[in-house]
């Protein structure tokens, strides 16, 4: 089997409307906790907190 890499693909979910607006990658060796960023939500039309979720 293939070896697991340190880079993982994740989705960023808006904390207000609960939609997954962004996808990005994260290095698990450098960032241990969940990623939280202030990003623009086009559905709410404002900057909101986006939290890391898994891509299904």
UniProtKB/Swiss-Prot annotation:
Keywords: Ribonucleoprotein, Ribosomal protein. SUPFAM superfamilies: Zn-binding ribosomal proteins. GO terms for cellular component: cytoplasm; ribonucleoprotein complex; ribosome. GO terms for molecular function: structural constituent of ribosome. InterPro entries: Ribosomal_bL33 (IPR001705), Ribosomal_bL33_CS (IPR018264), Ribosomal_bL33_sf (IPR038584), Ribosomal_zn-bd (IPR011332). Disulfide bonds: none annotated. PROSITE patterns: RIBOSOMAL_L33 (PS00582). Signal peptide: none annotated. One of its GO terms (biological process) is translation. It holds the Pfam family Ribosomal_L33. Belongs to the bacterial ribosomal protein bL33 family. This is Large ribosomal subunit protein bL33. It comes from Treponema denticola (strain ATCC 35405 / DSM 14222 / CIP 103919 / JCM 8153 / KCTC 15104). The gene is rpmG.
